[in-house]
Amino acid sequence: MYYEEINVGDSFPTLQKDEITRVQLVKYAGASGDFNPLHTVEEVGEQAGTGIIAHGMLIMGMAAQGVTTWIPRKNVKKFQVRFKKMTKPGESIEITGKVLEKKENNIIVGEVLAMNSEGEVKLAGIFEGVLPSKND
């Protein structure tokens, strides 16, 4: 993909992630070191009034995976997100993205969204990436 081939408004291919499972959350807790029981213990989730929720960083990682399937990781220069809603076990996440702006020096600015199957936005973010030019 070259900078010259990209237009503002272009969408990137959707990345469909499998349903979030409790086993996945336990494994992620071990891998990340985030053992907050809100992510793994039903009673704690109930006391908090939310039930078990996925780690925000897990959803952010999925969004980053989407971005890096579109732009090589070494070319991503900025990645910022805001968490919009909690993600719960049983939800499937879809990562979408589109080009918002083209800048000088082959830089594109894009939006990335993580949504569940009902279209609820769980995470919204902005990224910048550098693309190769046909003229280089």
Each language-model region and where it sits:
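Hot-dog-fold acyl-thioester-processing enzymes
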Residues: 1-75, 136
